[in-house]
């Protein structure tokens, strides 16, 4: 619905030379990023603020976006309950139709939100065509432009997503403490954690200490943690050699440890497993996983472009905990020597189903000694 201004030109330029014209909204400008898509029907405030989307241009396949607007931020003990970080992390947004909001708690439109945060958007794009191209050719770099023409796109596209370290922008510069109801401290090695994960830890009474991702094992142990969580985050995990080294050092303390998404990948590489780039990744809120310990199937939220592609790539002394029946990717493992569990998917969802929030209950039992 053209409810604010339909005169702003918008462009999406793909690395393979494809140029698509639409209508710009949000902030005017040009952004460059890896073109990725999500099939989620809702949850655009959470998706856009997910730090894992740093460096990426998000294409949403659902045709109607914006119809419930953008709510006011809500905090519990410094933790956002309706956004995944303090700001939009994606480089830009590509959608089919921008709709006028109609919901009681909407404080601004999607256009106003993107405008206030300096993020360009383009609508009126055949998102199905974009997705078909990405699915057949794989993820690629792209340019999004709102109200500005793109000259010399080849110059912009010299940047390569796989070669850039994005966690320097999403990891905190100093420790952040969220006081819980108990004295049980969980240190989060924060590569760009979603607030949904923080909230699940808070609900279980933990005092959460978020530390920069480059913190050494000695600095982490200064907080006397009873458990560790290695968080999600953006970018190519194979570039994060220092973080892998730190993980190898900290696991010698044998603390109960949970790795989620990027944290799962870091743990995998630290213990000798292999993490590889996927053709177009998993980004959706309806991905199935099978729990090998029970045989049960769960519907889960995914946002990752790298993965353990087969059971042969898991670390030694681990057993596969979850796998995706669609393509066989390993979605979690349990270590047989160290007190470590991991999930590639997001057990906190946000957005998505709450089928596997019990993973945090399992982690709590590990921390308090009942596992």
UniProtKB/Swiss-Prot annotation:
Keyword Secreted attached: no
Domain Glutamine amidotransferase type-1: 185-371
Top-tier EC class: ligase
Function description: Small subunit of the glutamine-dependent carbamoyl phosphate synthetase (CPSase). CPSase catalyzes the formation of carbamoyl phosphate from the ammonia moiety of glutamine, carbonate, and phosphate donated by ATP, constituting the first step of 2 biosynthetic pathways, one leading to arginine and/or urea and the other to pyrimidine nucleotides. The small subunit (glutamine amidotransferase) binds and cleaves glutamine to supply the large subunit with the substrate ammonia.
EC annotation from Swiss-Prot or TrEMBL: 6.3.5.5
Catalysed reaction, written as an equation: hydrogencarbonate + L-glutamine + 2 ATP + H2O = carbamoyl phosphate + L-glutamate + 2 ADP + phosphate + 2 H(+)
A single GO molecular function term of this UniProt record: glutaminase activity
Species of origin: Sulfolobus acidocaldarius (strain ATCC 33909 / DSM 639 / JCM 8929 / NBRC 15157 / NCIMB 11770)
Catalytic residues (positions): 261, 346, 348
Name recorded for this polypeptide: Carbamoyl phosphate synthase small chain
Disulfide bonds: none
């Amino acid at each position: 619905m053209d409810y604010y201004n339909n005169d702003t030109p918008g462009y999406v330029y793909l690395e393979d030379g494809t140029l698509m014209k639409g209508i710009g909204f949000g902030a005017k400008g040009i952004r460059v990023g890896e073109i990725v898509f999500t099939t989620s029907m809702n949850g655009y405030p959470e998706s856009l603020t997910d730090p894992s989307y740093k460096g990426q241009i998000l294409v949403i396949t659902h045709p109607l976006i914006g119809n419930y607007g953008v709510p006011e931020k809500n905090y519990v003990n410094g933790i956002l309950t309706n956004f995944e970080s303090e700001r939009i992390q994606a480089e830009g947004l590509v959608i089919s139709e921008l709709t006028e909001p109609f919901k009681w708690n909407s404080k601004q439109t999607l256009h106003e939100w993107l405008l206030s945060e300096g993020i360009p958007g383009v609508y009126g794009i055949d998102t199905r065509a974009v997705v078909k191209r990405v699915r057949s050719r794989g993820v690629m770099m792209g340019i999004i432009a709102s109200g500005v023409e793109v000259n010399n796109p080849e110059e912009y596209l010299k940047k390569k997503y796989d070669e850039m370290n994005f966690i320097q922008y999403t990891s905190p510069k100093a420790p952040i403490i969220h006081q819980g109801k108990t004295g049980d401290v969980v240190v989060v090695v924060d590569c760009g954690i979603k607030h949904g994960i923080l909230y699940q830890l808070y609900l279980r009474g933990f005092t959460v200490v978020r530390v920069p991702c480059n913190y050494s094992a000695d600095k982490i142990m200064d907080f006397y943690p009873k458990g560790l969580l290695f968080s999600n985050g953006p970018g190519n995990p194979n570039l994060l050699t220092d973080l892998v080294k730190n993980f190898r050092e900290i696991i010698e303390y044998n603390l109960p440890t949970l790795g989620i998404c990027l944290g799962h990948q870091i743990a995998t590489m630290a213990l000798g497993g292999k993490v590889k780039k996927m053709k177009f990744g998993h980004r959706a809120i309806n991905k199935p996983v099978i729990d090998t310990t029970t045989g049960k199937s769960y519907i889960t939220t995914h946002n990752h472009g790298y993965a353990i592609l087969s059971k042969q790539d898991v670390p030694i002394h681990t057993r596969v905990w979850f796998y995706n029946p669609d393509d066989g990717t390993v979605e979690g493992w349990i270590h047989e020597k160290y007190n470590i569990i991991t999930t590639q998917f997001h057990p906190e969802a946000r957005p998505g189903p709450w089928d596997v929030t019990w993973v945090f209950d399992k982690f709590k039992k590990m921390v308090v000694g009942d596992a």
